[in-house]
């Protein structure tokens, strides 16, 4: 927590920072859109999107009406997307600081990473909670491949469950593999299976953020 954040939030706790990561096409932007729409009437939200060379995700969120345009900031990371959320998160930390100058009462800052691999993780300096998203269309074997995104994220999301019959994926196998990969000495780390086209599983993701992030409505 920086002194900047404390100085700008004398009456409230610093905003909860929620990092959303996952491979290209897994549904990160759709999840962020749905979370914003589900939570913006209760909480003061802002969002940072990461793309390598464009600000396409920022545009998509704006067009969808997820949040007002001024509450969404696109960051062009260049190079490897994981660098901007892990090894050198300065570009995102600067973006957050800029957004909090404009919206000092923000309750939640969402940070969507650029599409990356299973090894992607957020720096603790950048994110308080991490959500890692994969999609069923990538194959039922993905959960058992492991990697920090699957094993260490605070919440693991298996998205696009509706596609399972079309790609020959067994959701039961994916669930069992996920349980095996996310079981630690302290117990099972949470995961959710979602179909965001029908909002299936969305309420569980919102509840996780509210409970784990100890949010209080604005």
Swiss-Prot record:
Subcellular localization(s) per the UniProt record: Cytoplasm
Q: Where does GTP bind?
A: 22-29
User: Would I find Methyltransferase among this entry's keywords?
Assistant: no
Q: Which UniProt keywords apply?
A: Chaperone, Cytoplasm, GTP-binding, Nickel insertion, Nucleotide-binding
One annotated GO molecular function is: nickel cation binding
Does the keyword field hold Iron? no
Q: Which InterPro entries match?
A: CobW/HypB/UreG_nucleotide-bd, P-loop_NTPase, UreG
Q: Which GO terms describe its biological process?
A: urea catabolic process
Q: Name one GO cellular component term.
A: cytoplasm
The subunit structure is: Homodimer. UreD, UreF and UreG form a complex that acts as a GTP-hydrolysis-dependent molecular chaperone, activating the urease apoprotein by helping to assemble the nickel containing metallocenter of UreC. The UreE protein probably delivers the nickel.
UniProt similarity note: Belongs to the SIMIBI class G3E GTPase family. UreG subfamily.
| Known role | Facilitates the functional incorporation of the urease nickel metallocenter. This process requires GTP hydrolysis, probably effectuated by UreG.
The protein in question is named Urease accessory protein UreG
Q: Which organism is it from?
A: Polaromonas naphthalenivorans (strain CJ2)
Q: What is the lineage of its organism?
A: Bacteria, Pseudomonadati, Pseudomonadota, Betaproteobacteria, Burkholderiales
Question: Gene encoding this chain?
Answer: ureG
């Amino acid at each position: 927590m920086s002194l900047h954040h404390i100085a700008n939030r004398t009456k409230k706790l610093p905003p909860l920072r929620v990092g959303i990561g996952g491979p290209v096409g897994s549904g990160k932007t759709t999840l962020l859109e749905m979370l914003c729409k589900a939570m913006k009437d209760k909480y003061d939200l802002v969002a940072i999107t990461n793309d390598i060379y464009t600000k396409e995700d920022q545009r998509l969120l704006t067009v969808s009406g997820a949040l007002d345009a001024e509450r969404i900031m696109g960051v062009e990371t260049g190079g490897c997307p994981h660098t901007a959320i892990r090894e050198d998160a300065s570009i995102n930390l600067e973006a957050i600081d800029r957004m909090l100058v404009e919206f000092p009462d923000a309750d939640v800052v969402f940070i969507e990473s650029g599409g990356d691999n299973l090894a992607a993780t957020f720096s603790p300096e950048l994110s308080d909670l991490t959500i890692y998203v994969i999609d069923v269309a990538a194959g039922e074997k993905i959960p058992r491949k492991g990697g920090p995104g699957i094993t260490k994220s605070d919440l693991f999301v298996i998205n696009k469950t509706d596609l399972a019959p079309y790609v020959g994926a067994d959701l039961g196998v994916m669930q069992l593999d996920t349980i095996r990969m996310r079981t630690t000495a302290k117990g099972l780390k949470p995961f959710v299976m979602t179909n965001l086209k029908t909002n299936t599983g969305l309420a569980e993701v919102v509840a996780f953020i509210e409970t784990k992030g100890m949010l209080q409505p604005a």
